[in-house]
UniProtKB/Swiss-Prot annotation:
GO cellular component, one term: cytoplasm
Protein's UniProt keywords contain Methyltransferase: no
GO MF annotations in UniProt: leucyl-tRNA--protein transferase activity
Gene expressing this chain: aat
Name by which UniProt lists this protein: Leucyl/phenylalanyl-tRNA--protein transferase
UniProt xrefs under SUPFAM superfamilies: Acyl-CoA N-acyltransferases (Nat) (SSF55729)
Location of this chain's protein in the cell: Cytoplasm
A Pfam short name: Leu_Phe_trans
GO biological process per UniProt: protein catabolic process
Organism annotation: Chlorobium phaeobacteroides (strain DSM 266 / SMG 266 / 2430)
Tree of life domain: Bacteria
């Protein structure tokens, strides 16, 4: 079982947990290169902007956190394995109950169509995972997250490990020392996600 105080302390030190997909053993990650999303320069793609204008999705915050984390942990077409073990899921469900972990959800005709979840600490948001069941749902959730963070004065959106999808969303890689500097500044501020 992951102790909540240890988990929060780890994030403050630039670490985050992942589970081995084969045996579900939890280990701590601290990549040398960190993916972050520069909040001030973020712009949605033309396709996402079009979807936003059409208002296809109802966006909610924390109305079904468990549904989002389960959606993120579910096997994907491209990869049947997940790093979100039951132990990690339980820890984040507790963090949600404590008001530290949050979900941004896209609903379409009353069904959860996609979303993302992460942790809010100070002026930093640590994006953990996203999923979709309907095209563009996770990207719309991401757009709403970025706008919420900008509106509230957040300084850091940590996307953890770069991948092609994050790169399309505007993430860039920074080295560990720069990340820790940005993290330290962000943790020194008090901002409420909700």
């Amino acid at each position: 079982m992951i102790r909540i105080d240890e988990l929060l302390r780890a994030y403050r030190k630039g670490l985050f947990p992942m589970a081995d997909p084969d045996d579900e053993k939890v280990y701590w990650c601290q990549p040398y290169k960190r993916a972050v999303v520069p909040l001030l320069s973020y712009m949605p793609s033309r396709d996402v902007a079009r979807i936003l204008r059409r208002g296809e999705f109802e966006v909610r915050i924390d109305s079904d956190f468990e549904g989002v984390i389960r959606g993120c942990a579910a096997p994907r077409k491209s990869d049947s394995q997940t790093w979100i073990s039951p132990e990690i899921m339980d820890a984040y469900l507790t963090l949600n109950q404590l008001g530290v972990a949050h979900s941004v959800e896209c609903w379409h005709h009353g069904e959860l169509s996609g979303g993302l979840y992460g942790l809010s600490m100070g002026a930093a948001f640590f994006g953990e995972s996203m999923f979709f069941r309907r095209s563009y749902a996770s990207q719309v959730a991401f757009d709403h997250l970025v706008r919420r963070l900008k509106d509230r004065g957040y300084l850091l959106l940590d996307a953890q490990i770069m991948n092609p999808h994050l790169q399309k969303l505007g993430a860039v890689e920074i080295d560990h020392d720069e990340y820790m500097l940005q993290l330290d500044i962000a943790l020194g501020k008090k901002i409420r996600f909700i």
